């Protein structure tokens, strides 16, 4: 805090572009009666605000802004369309509630007695990538190592989330080396679900489970490892506090599991953790970067199911839904900086980069921040270093997908420092439960919601359509959001919607 204030006194708002890290802060200059809000370049830390009669109310959470008596828990048609057709994502500037906005990543805002102005201090720029392949490999390695080194600075013991995937393994390896140099042992943490070995079902989105890869990395690094195993009953029950943590419906049990996991990590004595988010967005780790039939589809690649969503709603729940989604998608594509020399695929990869950065990555970062902070745990994300982002944005796709592999450049950069099974493990997302008890618990909960005539959430859904999913949960062929969210997560999302409408007494206008 002291460094930040001194930097502001020296350089005013020019100080913001000199910062490296994750932050959201406000500076009040009493004499000038000037308030300055600023948010980090990638939006790792949230910052919400709303105009009021004599100024501005703001905070790191939506709840904080809602505490002001002039701010009403009201959503309009855009907010409802966001929840039902884009959720759990939301437009970058939206707080979903009608009066609440989100300060955009890489922006600062200034409030004076005269006016309120919004300014950009960082944005992506398109450049020719001038480094050859060996230099690019070396530079990628250097940037990731330096970002991790910066994030390892801590006054309290630090641990790592370890899934046995490439990204968490790289960070755990770098942290373990740092700890070994001080003759200390790194603690690592992983999450799993009861009976997941029995019920796990592989797919193109989730080709394998984590267990054997975690064991291999723990043996390789010699970390003190902790496993958290979650029960389906606890996972379902935690959907409610997970909604409260976001102050919005979220990623269903992808949220509630992380909430329980973070709480367990905190109880275990850890205060700060490193996590591998964002490498997939930057270096092309997701299937939608590689499947041609998805890559050039004219919609959000992780949420191609607007028709499915509309089919689950009552006919009058939302209007002009498809156009609403399409407009947000196209506006985002138009924001992607491009070069006149970009070919069709290169231009599309730039669009995909910005789509993922502004929407999918933002959703995951919001999830990580809210679930961890609600548990009193600080989670750092070294791959979100803006220098890595800038370098990756202009890197040719052939380099990123080196050897025809997702994140091929990152694999090559760390090939000599990790077991080959880890280096060449196919991308697998955050683990989810496949336990039938969880599906049944969520379906039963939704039935109770639908029996309650006071439920706003229930009034939005076509009960027959949802009932058909309950009868045949396997009928949903692909995720309706991201890589993990299928039929059980539809039920869980309805539960979270119901909780949100009730808890915040939300009105639709």
Each predicted region: which residue ranges?
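Short acidic/histidine-rich active-site segments
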Residues: 270-280, 284-286
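Hydrophobic pocket-lining residues that define ligand/cofactor binding sites across diverse proteins
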Residues: 265
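An alpha-helix initiation/capping motif
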Residues: 2, 21, 138, 164, ...
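A mobile, often basic/glycine-rich helix-loop segment
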Residues: 282-308
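Adenosyl-5′-phosphate
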Residues: 14, 66-72, 98-105, 115-116, ...
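Cysteine-centered catalytic environments shared across enzyme families
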Residues: 1-240, 244-245, 258, 415-416, ...
């Amino acid at each position: 805090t002291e460094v930040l204030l001194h930097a502001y006194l020296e350089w005013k708002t020019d100080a913001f572009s000199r910062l490296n890290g994750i932050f959201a802060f406000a500076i009040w200059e009493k004499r000038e009666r000037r308030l300055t809000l600023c948010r980090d370049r990638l939006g790792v830390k949230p910052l919400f605000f709303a105009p009021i009669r004599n100024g501005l109310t703001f905070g790191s959470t939506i709840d904080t802004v809602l505490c002001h008596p002039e701010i009403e828990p009201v959503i309009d048609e855009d907010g409802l369309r966001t929840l039902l057709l884009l959720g759990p994502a939301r437009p970058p500037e939206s707080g979903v509630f009608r009066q609440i906005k989100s300060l955009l990543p890489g922006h600062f805002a200034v409030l004076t007695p005269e006016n309120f102005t919004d300014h950009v201090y960082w944005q992506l720029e398109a450049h020719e990538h001038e480094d050859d392949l060996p230099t690019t490999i070396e530079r990628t390695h250097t940037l990731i190592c330096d970002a991790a080194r910066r994030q390892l600075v801590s006054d309290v013991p630090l641990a790592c989330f370890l899934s046995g995937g490439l990204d968490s393994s790289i960070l755990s390896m770098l942290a373990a080396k740092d700890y070994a140099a001080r003759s200390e042992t790194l603690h690592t943490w992983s999450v799993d679900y009861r009976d997941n070995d029995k019920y796990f079902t592989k797919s193109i989105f989730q080709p394998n489970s984590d267990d054997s890869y975690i064991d291999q990395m723990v043996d390789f690094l010699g970390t003190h490892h902790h496993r958290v195993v979650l029960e389906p009953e606890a996972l379902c029950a935690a959907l409610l506090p997970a909604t409260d943590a976001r102050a919005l419906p979220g990623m269903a049990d992808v949220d509630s599991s992380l909430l329980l996991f973070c709480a367990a990590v905190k109880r275990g004595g850890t205060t700060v953790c490193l996590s591998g988010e964002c490498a997939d967005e930057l270096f092309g780790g997701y299937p939608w970067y590689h499947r041609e039939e998805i890559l050039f589809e004219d919609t959000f690649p992780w949420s191609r199911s607007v028709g499915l969503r509309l089919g689950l709603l009552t006919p009058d729940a939302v209007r002009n839904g498809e156009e609403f989604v399409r407009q947000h998608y196209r506006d985002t594509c138009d924001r992607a900086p491009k070069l006149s020399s970009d070919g069709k695929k290169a231009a599309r990869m730039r669009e995909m980069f910005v789509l993922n950065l502004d929407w999918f990555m933002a959703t995951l970062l919001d999830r990580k921040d809210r679930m961890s902070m609600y548990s009193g745990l600080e989670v750092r994300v070294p791959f979100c270093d803006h220098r890595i982002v800038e370098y990756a944005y202009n890197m040719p796709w052939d380099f990123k997908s080196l050897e025809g592999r997702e994140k091929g450049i990152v694999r090559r950069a760390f090939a000599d420092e990790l077991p080959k099974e880890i280096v060449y493990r196919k991308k697998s997302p955050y683990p989810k439960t496949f336990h039938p008890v969880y599906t049944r618990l969520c379906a039963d909960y939704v039935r109770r919601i639908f029996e309650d005539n006071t439920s706003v959430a229930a009034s939005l859904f076509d009960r027959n359509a949802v009932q058909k999913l309950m009868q045949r949960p396997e009928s949903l062929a692909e995720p309706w959001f991201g890589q993990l969210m299928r039929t059980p997560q539809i039920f869980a999302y309805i539960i979270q919607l119901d909780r949100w409408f009730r808890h915040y007494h939300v009105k639709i206008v």
